[in-house]
Amino acid sequence: MSDFPLSVRNASISFGERTVLNHVSFNVLPNRILGIAGPNGSGKTTLLRSLFGAQPLHEGEIRLFDVPLKKLKPSQISTQLAVVSQFEYDASRMRVWDLVMLGRAPHRKDMQGYSKVDVTHTQRALSLVGMSDAKDRYLHSLSGGERQRALIARALAQDCPCIVLDEPTNHLDITYQHQILALIRELSTTAVIVLHDLNLVSRYCDDVIVLKDGKVACYGTPSDVLTPSTIRETYDIDTLEVRDSGMKQFIFRG
């Protein structure tokens, strides 16, 4: 029995002659946040989508709580793994409350409506992301940041042991970027997060994978992996490492 909530072995994906993921392997440790970083086109979103079955592997295997992902039905995956994706369906005529309540759908035993437990989870999720007062608003009336927080609330309402998030800080101002990532840390859940901002990776992630050209360029803790030399090798940009209140930060130089 594996101790890893998610395990990826030799994951490979190609589109035509272009290899997007090239024998990627890693484990996601329980109750830790794994950041996925790398330059544009390095395979981050493709890798994340493969973790919940949206993008099938051409080679290799992904295991969710030691069960091969390809053997699980979507309904089974959705009780174990919540998703915040960059690519969401158009639900602009839906209310915030209804969107977040959809997170409870995998737990419904029948089609007779939602239970008091479902309502409690939905209320809690909205409160956690600061959207309680917006529960009756329609999605089309929300700003990009508000809509992003509503999507995160839906994933939290799902109450899964794992959550994967693709650029969850998109459309959020600096305050909410830190609030959302701090919240995920406080929940002590197992999380996999694609992030472009290496300073956010350094501050909030326990472990990090840096992809380059579809391969794992480096894998470890942010303090070990994120250094000016590895950033230079991966991103082809110079950085100055500084300390801010004991936290490692990078200043990017042209």
Annotate the PLM regions.
Residues 6, 20-21:
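Conserved structural motif at the start of ABC-family nucleotide-binding domains
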Residues 60-68, 77:
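Conserved ABC transporter NBD signature motif
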Residues 228-254:
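ABC ATPase nucleotide-binding domains
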